[in-house]
């Protein structure tokens, strides 16, 4: 079997013996960031010491990679947790900022159209059907890009993300599936440019894409395609393993045998095992109460960009009703979707249920948790009943996605008010206040920047 080639940066290559002399693998210690709000360690190559320096300590940092670059002071301009300017970047990337008068743009950002879609033939190892990695694969097949900057699994831990440059279409197969954790994706921008890549595609989460767009004009690439995935909450790989252990303990399973996990839009978490078993757990049955208070770092609890509004195309699942959910945002996004041709089956997205009640209940729980009070937990006997009802009467399709965006907005206001009130006027965009206003959250003195 011939292993697909991934183009790892020169400082991250490792030769693997005579029969694999041309196979490029990550180093034994790929990228191992520590939890946000702590110091991120340097990259290492075995026997040669640090190659890229450690990220400097910052209170709110997801280690997107810019602080590991040769000009780390660019973080002041690039970081969405310092002084983001979404209207300006939306206008630069899409030709206009979001228009609250257009359907769903207040929630999802600028977009030309929203779709529910799936590949006709799902790709092996993909998280859903494989639209994201297939688009990137097509970019390489057609020669539209020289390389794709994305994440692959650590060879020693399938859940740990490792930043990679992929230069061969077949290499994208190794990048399918979900990772959980932090990896400095954008630290590879300078190596990509140094290797002569002029046309680049990037697959990233919102905090990475914001920094990429903020610096795009000075990066030196002739063409840049950005495929975004939504991101609701992230945590460290180590914390994620703790979560897997809690899930596995309920059925006396080995957490190391869990090969797949997904939070589905039908209010269930799906797990798959190495032996082929599939297990679906209702959200209400998850052992969330056993997680430590810092399981989700403050960066994720105060993020204002769930839908990745600065990508050319966003590929997620929240509005997909069991399929994938696409937001085609601009002309380049249309070009990316067109690469799939008749490989993809598109549908109009649906919407059902009401979101106000669930979001209001979520707000009450977030306020109690932020104040250190115990959550009001549902009686155990009632959980199976409500778990059965939620997929049938709760928000579904686009209404489910709207609810999740509003929950993230609510979470941002509540936690930032408590943990970083001095940041409110610079970190919270105007559209977030519009999202939370129906739930009684309005800015007080000093929480909103004066009009420009």
Model-flagged regions — what are they?
Residues 126-154:
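Low-complexity, highly charged intrinsically disordered N-terminal segments
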Residues 161-185:
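Glycine-rich phosphate-binding "P-loop"
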Residues 225-245, 356:
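Short, flexible loop segments at boundaries between secondary-structure elements
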Residues 8-11:
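Tryptophan (W) side chains
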Residues 81-132:
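Entry/capping segment at the start of metal-dependent catalytic domains
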Residues 29-97, 313:
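Iron-sulfur cluster-binding cysteine motifs and their immediate structural context
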Residues 145-146, 248, 253-452:
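Long, compositionally biased charged/polar accessory segments in the mid-to-C-terminal portions
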């Amino acid at each position: 079997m011939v292993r697909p080639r991934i183009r790892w940066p020169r400082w991250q290559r490792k030769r693997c013996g005579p029969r694999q002399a041309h196979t490029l693998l990550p180093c034994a210690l790929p990228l191992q960031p520590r939890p946000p709000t702590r110091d991120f360690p340097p990259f290492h190559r075995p026997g040669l010491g640090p190659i890229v320096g450690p990220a400097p300590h910052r209170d709110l940092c997801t280690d997107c990679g810019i602080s590991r670059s040769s000009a780390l002071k660019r973080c002041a301009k690039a970081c969405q947790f310092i002084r983001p300017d979404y209207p300006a970047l939306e206008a630069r990337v899409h030709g206009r900022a979001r228009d609250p008068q257009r359907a769903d743009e207040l929630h999802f950002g600028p977009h030309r159209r929203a779709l529910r879609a799936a590949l006709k033939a799902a790709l092996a190892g993909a998280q859903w059907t494989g639209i994201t990695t297939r688009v990137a694969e097509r970019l390489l097949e057609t020669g539209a890009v020289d390389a794709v900057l994305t994440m692959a699994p650590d060879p020693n831990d399938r859940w740990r993300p490792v930043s990679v440059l992929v230069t061969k279409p077949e290499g994208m197969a190794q990048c399918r599936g979900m990772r959980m954790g932090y990896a400095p994706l954008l630290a590879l921008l300078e190596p990509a440019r140094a290797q002569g890549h002029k046309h680049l595609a990037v697959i990233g989460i919102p905090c990475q894409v914001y920094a990429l767009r903020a610096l795009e004009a000075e990066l030196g690439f002739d063409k840049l395609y950005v495929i975004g995935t939504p991101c609701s909450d992230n945590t460290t790989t180590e914390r994620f393993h703790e979560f897997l252990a809690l899930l596995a303990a309920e059925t006396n399973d080995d957490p190391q045998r869990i090969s797949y996990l997904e939070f589905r839009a039908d209010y269930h978490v799906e797990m798959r095992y190495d032996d082929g078993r599939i297990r679906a757990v209702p959200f209400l049955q998850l052992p969330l109460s056993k997680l430590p208070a810092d399981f989700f770092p403050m960066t994720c609890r105060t993020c204002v960009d769930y839908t990745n509004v600065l990508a050319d195309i966003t590929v997620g699942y929240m509005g997909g009703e069991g399929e994938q959910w696409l937001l085609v945002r601009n002309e380049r996004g249309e070009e990316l979707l067109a690469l799939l041709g008749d490989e993809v089956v598109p549908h109009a997205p649906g919407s059902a249920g009401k979101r106000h009640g669930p979001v209001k209940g979520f707000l009450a729980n977030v306020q109690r948790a932020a104040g250190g009070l115990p959550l009001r937990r549902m009686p155990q006997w009632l959980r199976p009943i409500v778990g059965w009802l939620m997929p049938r009467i709760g928000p579904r399709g686009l209404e489910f996605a709207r609810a999740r965006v509003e929950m993230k907005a609510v979470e941002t206001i509540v936690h930032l008010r408590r943990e970083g009130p001095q940041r409110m006027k610079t970190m919270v965009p105007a559209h977030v206040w519009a999202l939370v206003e129906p739930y009684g959250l309005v800015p007080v003195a000093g929480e909103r920047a004066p009009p420009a």
